[in-house]
């Protein structure tokens, strides 16, 4: 509909992630989109040997509209977000809408990924409006975009989480669907518990990935023994990736608490 109205649409999806979708994009779907003048490309198409492509994927979820409105978080564009999955039920997630200067950061990330994959060189003022309307925030809140480009800066997001955990004085609240944290994240949480910080962790009781709940239960139980409070979400599958520190700082994004993310 928007393409028929003259809106230029560019879309990128991860080739490996698409294969794991319950209703993946097929060649016929891509052909139909291209026929409607929608540019759509795969990030890092799967080629032999496939193992070389399995780990460093594009897990970002970004939408930028007219360079003025951005969306990011944990949500994929998939059928199961509407209908759920028979084996796990309804799918729950968290996304945020952003307006103002922080949208420029999301735009830069998209353009970098797009130009790197397509070898195009798009950019310029049309993507970065010179003036953004003033956007009121509740209590002068600040927004920062922290990004890890696939195959680059592998520890950036991990360090961001650890620094936030280390800064906690009263409470840490985590929701993550695949809770198998690295040793460094576990140590940061254990150190927080040792200094009297309340740590609350919510993990889903069911998962779209086999054996993930078992691994998450084990990791969470180890922290429970150190004093953490563990909550199991049984209302379907909770795909959100959220961390709150002292009810003052919050992350909403696409990073899972596992070594791959």
List PLM regions with ranges.
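Charged, low-complexity intrinsically disordered terminal segments
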Residues: 1-261
